[in-house]
Amino acid sequence: GGDSRYDADYPSISYLSAISRVAGAERQIYAANANDFIYTTDGGGRDHGFLHLEATIKSTENPRRLKPINVYYHMYAGEKTAQLEAVRYHLDAARQALVTPVAASHYAAIADGFFATQISSLGELTWLVRNRGALQTVRFDDVADLSVDFARSVGVIGQQRKGSSLYVALDEARADVIVALSPDTPSAGTPAPYLIDGRWTFRDLRRRDCGFSVMARGYGTGQMNWGGLRPGSYQVTAFDDQDQSWEETAD
């Protein structure tokens, strides 16, 4: 359900669905975007119609992120060349984009967490976040001059700025977290390692005087960028679930 579109045929934000709908005692989480069937049977009968998903993805990303990316297709798309090529186009784009692939069930859990989360103020620019479930990101708008104060925050893994908005990544390993912000100045404090972006999900970040450790999992190559590191050489060691290790030195 949902069938969100925001393109030349549906040129309004009003065509974007809500996160969910309440059905009796249950909550139905909508798919983020319309599926291939909607695009190929919208009146034009266009076999290439699913390509127009790209317009919705771009329109809901800028100037403000409104929806996640959702490549929702059916196996019968393989029956026609144009439909199959459209699916391949979006999957290839997703592999190259700076996104974090998650299972559909994980997205539904994140959406459920949105409705359960409780945020309370602990003072100036400081908040306690509780009962968030699988929701691990919060966004602050119109804070171009603020950043995370990692010295006062608890359970915060990272931050990333998008325009005047600040996205803050929370640690799944902590039930309750504290998010503190402070003016973004060169002398804001001692650097602390933090996640900028990554194609995997991360949890249980433990910062130490000479480094840090974190658990990660996901799909595909584990590409990631970290900030807050002092200049110098770092020994990077990775262990899989079989305790097999990989080591590399990075500057």
Question: PLM ranges: what are they?
Answer:
Residues 1-28, 84:
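Catalytic domains of cell-wall/extracellular-matrix polysaccharide-remodeling enzymes
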Residues 2-9, 31-35, 130-143:
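Short, surface-exposed, charge-dense and proline/glycine-enriched linear segments
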Residues 5-9, 77-81, 110-111:
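Flexible loop/turn segments at secondary-structure boundaries
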Residues 9-11, 80-82, 137-139, 224:
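Extended hydrophobic-aromatic, low-complexity segments
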Residues 20-42, 128-135:
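Short, basic, helix/turn surface patches
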Residues 22, 30-32, 50-53, 61-67, ...:
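A structural signal for short secondary-structure junctions
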Residues 30-106:
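Catalytic grooves of carbohydrate-active enzymes
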Residues 93, 98-251:
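Non-catalytic C-terminal accessory domains or segments of carbohydrate-active enzymes
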